[in-house]
Swiss-Prot record:
It catalyses: uridine(55) in tRNA = pseudouridine(55) in tRNA. Belongs to the pseudouridine synthase TruB family. Type 1 subfamily. Keywords: Isomerase, tRNA processing. NCBIfam families: TruB (TIGR00431). The lineage of its organism: Bacteria, Pseudomonadati, Pseudomonadota, Alphaproteobacteria, Rhodobacterales. This is tRNA pseudouridine synthase B. It is an enzyme of class 5 (isomerase). InterPro entries: PsdUridine_synth_cat_dom_sf, PsdUridine_synth_N, tRNA_psdUridine_synth_TruB, TruB_C. The gene is truB.
Length: 301
């Protein structure tokens, strides 16, 4: 007999406006506890000191997490010029200083190298695995790591403000796997003055926006109540970047069993990824081929 999972079978998304000083895992655990949910996971880690959008998937919505982690994300952050730290943010020990301060024009010129397809070396204190161990664990032990550069798509990177000579506020829209701390570090090096992230906020992630997020304080206040459920968004929100194909009754039945099922296609092309719905409910995600959806993920709703 299968093991019974404890908790309520809730499926959907809860968008949390994560506060500084809390890990992404701690937020997920709080959401799971507050909703008494059987299953929960987040769609993209935020550093403990960062704030903003942390999209928490519940139940069957965890099957749509890859579509959010792969989506574009927007970050606003302040770079502190003139100082490098061990962690590339304000929490770390200062390891280098400079009296040089670039002009706005010099910063703008330097940003050009950080747009488009770039190669980025993760921070020493990051979750990247090195021979099975997390980089931050090795860095805490004093090791200096030679981390490999990784590709990153930067859609845009713009100056928002220049409060003073020591600071510049930036906004970046990027793809999966980007480290804002690396941008601040490398920008400082490119300008010859060092730099680190003073503060960081993720303003949106795929279809989810910070202004629609619920605070951790509100989660605590509404914990274990039906009122908290009203903040849970539909599972389909995580599929916003994929075309929706209505399934026929027979097609929906076949899809639920993991078999190709007939769908009503409009302008979806052969081989394109899409999701099927029936009577307003998501049924499956898969590849469209000749009038049928071939499922890769099936939702048990």
């Amino acid at each position: 007999m299968g093991r019974t999972r404890k908790g309520r079978a809730i499926s959907g998304w809860l968008v949390v406006d994560k506060p500084a000083g809390m890990t992404s895992t701690a937020v997920v655990n709080k959401v799971r506890w507050a909703l008494e949910a059987q299953k929960a996971g987040h769609a993209g880690t935020l550093d403990p000191d960062a704030t903003g959008v942390l999209a928490v998937a519940l139940g069957e919505a965890t099957k749509t997490v890859p579509y959010i982690t792969d989506a574009l994300k927007c970050y606003r952050f302040m770079v502190r010029l003139g100082l490098s730290t061990r962690t590339d943010d304000a929490s770390g020990e200062v390891i280098a200083t400079s009296e040089a301060r670039p002009t706005d024009a010099e910063i703008e010129a330097a940003l050009a190298a950080f747009r488009g397809e770039i190669q980025q070396v993760p921070p020493q204190f990051s979750a990247v695995k090195v021979e099975g161990e997390r980089a931050y664990d090795l860095a805490r032990d004093g090791e200096r790591l030679d981390l490999a550069a990784r590709p990153l798509w930067v859609e845009s990177l713009e100056i928002l403000s220049r409060p003073d000579a020591d600071h510049v506020e930036l906004e970046m829209v990027c793809g999966k796997g980007g480290y804002v701390r690396s941008i601040a570090r490398d920008l400082g090096e490119a300008l010859g003055c060092h730099g680190h992230v003073a503060w960081l906020r993720r303003t949106w992630s795929g279809p989810f926006e910070a202004e629609d997020g619920i605070s951790v304080a509100t989660i605590d206040e509404l914990a274990r109540s039906e009122a908290l459920l009203s903040h849970v968004l539909p599972l389909a929100k995580g599929l916003a970047d994929l075309p929706e194909l209505p399934a026929t009754p027979e097609g929906a039945a076949r899809l639920r069993c993991g078999n190709p099922g007939m769908v009503i296609a409009s302008d979806v092309e052969f081989g394109e990824e899409a999701w099927a719905s029936f009577q307003g409910q998501p049924v499956a995600v898969g590849i469209y081929k000749s009038g049928e959806l071939h499922p890769s993920r099936v939702f048990n709703l």
